[in-house]
Amino acid sequence: MNEELIAKNFHHPPWHLHGDAFILNYWLTPNFIKSNQAFQLAPSPIGRVIQIMLVRYHKSPVGPYDELLILDHPLMSKRHLSSIPKIYVSTPASVMNGQRFWGIPKQLAQFEWVIKDDVVYCNISFQQQEMSLHLQKYKHSQTFYINSHHIPAQLLNIHQTWQGLHYQFSPQFRGKLCKLKQASWKNTLDIFPDFSQAKYLQSFYVPEFKLTLPSAKMNKK
């Protein structure tokens, strides 16, 4: 790919994105974290809560795309910032821009969706391996408004390291969310931690949101 074509595929921040998402909350034990060291989860002697996000971006500067990521939250006593240690997306343009502008280690995967009433199935394929996620919404669930200003700033202060650079940025978002009934995983194999072995906490469906990704502060390692 020549330099001119590469330049056309880059869209400088800030980015403004719209979509819907599932936010899955899990409590991880120290043993779970140790057994999944390959996914770059920060160690913890007592365990902690992390989030998994499955997102469908309907509008973005690079067009619609799907995303599955781990959002690993800080250990307050050690002043670790939040990070995204593992992430898959469905388009090459999202991979290129995420790596370049935010240091996010995006990898290209295929997403297939099946939606039947209040049940959502998502199959994710990467390097000839396929995993599936089954999500069940409540038929009738109260919707709440959420804004990033309601969340402690440290939780949204994301720090990434990529190709010799440190990136730091704080996304801003607003939207609506409702409680999710259930989430189950199958065949995570080597491409994602098996969160069926972690403690599932109250999770949420976000039927609509608006997200802003600002420019990241960048420093050399």
Residue positions per predicted region:
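Short linear motifs at secondary-structure transitions and domain/linker junctions
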Residues: M1-E3, Y26-N31, A42-I50, V62-Y65, ...
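N-terminal domain-onset segments
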Residues: M1-E67, M76, H80-S82, K199, ...
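Interaction-surface and assembly-scaffold signal
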Residues: N2-L5, Q99-K221
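Histidine (H) residue identity feature
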Residues: H11-H12, H16-H18, H58, H73, ...
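Generic structural hydrophobic/aromatic packing signal, biased to beta-strands
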Residues: L24-Y26, I52-L54, I70-D72, I87, ...
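Aromatic- and glycine-enriched beta-alpha-beta binding-site module
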Residues: V55-E130
